[in-house]
């Protein structure tokens, strides 16, 4: 498959037509579930459609209804009965019954949330997961070429013990990347320690957390191999 990146309609970056490594773990897990799974920030279905094909019932969430309309059109007709569309911005606009989900997938969406929103969001995801359920998270870190100038600031905040060392109020103040208009003004670049803390406070157990370079990441984003952070946790 030829890799393509497509800008999101709501200017929250880009979506890929190739699942990243964390998303591949979610898709593989979807083959074994009996309860529905949730895909937060589903965009055009790079995770949702393969999870449907794996046999799962998928609640596809996105803050842009146009994304969900496109996702539904792209879903093969035989799989559409397994698809439930869930419009709204996480973690504010929708709720799901407690302990009803086998898995939650959130790839390249949590780094647009404030610290308070992350705290609320992890509490919700933990509540929604059934016993034995899995959480799959992928997010951007400060270690990306467009944000290289921010790394010393971030590392100083880490050393000072700040709770949210990767919070960037205005991305235009730390980067001159030519496509900054495709992302929100504020970003929350995440790391292993912050995700570990959020998971623990939500009452989940960490199975694995690691930094890596996604195979679908453009060369213009490459810095030192720690451009992304992945997390798998369980109830």
Predicted feature locations:
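Conserved alpha-helix/loop element of class I SAM-dependent methyltransferases that forms part
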Residues: 15-34
């Amino acid at each position: 498959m030829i890799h393509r990146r497509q800008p999101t309609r709501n200017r929250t970056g880009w979506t890929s037509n190739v699942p990243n490594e964390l998303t591949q773990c979610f898709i593989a897990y979807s083959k074994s579930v009996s309860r529905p799974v949730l895909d937060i920030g589903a965009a055009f279905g790079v995770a949702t459609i393969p999870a449907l094909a794996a046999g799962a019932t998928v609640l596809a969430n996105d803050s842009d209804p146009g994304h969900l309309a496109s996702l539904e059109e792209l879903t093969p007709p035989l799989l559409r009965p397994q698809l439930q569309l869930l419009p709204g911005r996480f973690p504010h606009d929708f709720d799901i019954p407690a302990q009803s989900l086998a898995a939650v997938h959130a790839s390249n969406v949590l780094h647009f949330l404030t610290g308070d929103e992350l705290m609320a969001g992890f509490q919700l995801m933990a509540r929604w997961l059934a016993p034995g359920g899995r959480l799959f998270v992928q997010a951007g870190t400060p270690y990306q070429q467009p944000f290289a100038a921010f790394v010393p600031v971030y590392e100083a905040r880490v050393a000072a013990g700040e709770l949210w060392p990767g919070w960037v109020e205005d991305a235009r103040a730390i980067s001159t990347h030519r496509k900054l208009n495709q992302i929100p003004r504020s970003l929350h670049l995440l790391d292993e320690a912050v995700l570990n803390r959020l998971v623990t406070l939500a009452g989940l157990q960490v199975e694995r957390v690691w930094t890596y370079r996604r195979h679908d990441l453009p060369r213009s984003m490459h810095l030192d191999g720690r451009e992304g952070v992945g997390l798998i946790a369980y109830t």
